[in-house]
Amino acid sequence: MTASAPTTDVADRSIWTRGFVYVFAINLVINLAQFMMNTLVPKLAVELGASAVVVGVVAGMFAVTALSVRPVVGPATVRLRRNHLLAGTSAVIMLAFVVYSVADSVPVMMAGRLLHGAGMGFLAPVMLALASDNLPERRMASGIGIFSLGQAVATAIGPSVGLALQPLVGYRWTFLAGAVVLALASLLALRVPSDPPAPPSGRLFSWRAFVASEAAVPAVVLFFLAGAYAGVTSFVVLYGEALGVRDIGLFFTAYALCVLVSRPVAGRIADRFGLTTVILPGMAVFAASFVLLAHARTLGAFLVAGAVSAFGYGVCQPAIQTMSLMSVDKARRGVAGNTSYIGVDLGYLVMPVVAGAVVSAAGRHGADVAQSYSTMFLTLVVPVVLGMVVFLVRGRRRATRVHEVSTDA
């Protein structure tokens, strides 16, 4: 079954094309499964005897294979139908969830994370490219922001569902429920309109096919920001439990609900006034959210921190990805998306391990468990500030040029 290709003029100026609706729905269900499982992976690792550092290693392990497959992701998005790639990679992640369901040791969990990473290495850039293929140029920032709302909705529902389901049916059946969701996404992917593969031109595995140099600066910024956010997803549940805070999964709900409000507004602002007007304030607010997390002691404080984070990372992350996509022509958006996710993968690989090491170091210096996590979250302000510096020095002018080109389209 092969879906028809999208039209050249993407439904004039409408965001909600048939293809975009399909991609939005798939993004929603895949992220629902992801967020159901992601909060359980660190918990299961702890129950299997992992230390804080090992929990960080397990959480970031998928980035190893995600990075390993990057050399073929760019060429694959050009030479193969993107909807077929989406179906196949969804199936790989489904198999990873099956591995989680039978994990009885940390090494088995690591094997599942490696398989998960192989799927994620393809999934994120392919999804981003398919979304941009079905959006008008002048509505790109708004469209990518709305596309990412699928992740926000899943963030609101997934962690709470996973944390509520696990005590009722156990880890095995919770992970298998996620696998069923991924199987449905894989089938739905075959219905997404997709352009036919581009005719061969040049070498298949050249540097240009692997990386879009135009997207290098956004990738570096995303390394710092996504890495800091990976510290949140890896440790906020454990931090809340160490403090005795019940229903800590509502942190993600608060984040997601505020993203539902902030992203459409931020997208319209970026389309009209430029990406910089969203990215810089977003990074400043994101840094402030870590200060709030470090001092959180009650559920209310965690909810406030989650809401602030939504107006920070939740706003600037899709804007930076839009900057990456708009820096190249349509045919190379898969490569640009791949480049931006190299930064994300490296952030998810490095930062949880660094964060876990900070927790362990604080513990060795006499801090209790909760104080150790508090110190770690405060430390995560540093990569956010570094990302801001990189953007100010190397990315600000490029973001302005991207906006000028899109308004002329």
For the regions a language model picked out, list residue spans one by one.
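Helix-breaking motifs and short loop linkers at transmembrane-helix boundaries and internal kinks
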Residues: 81, 102-108, 274, 295-297
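Helix-loop boundary and gating motifs at the non-cytosolic
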Residues: 17-56, 230-239
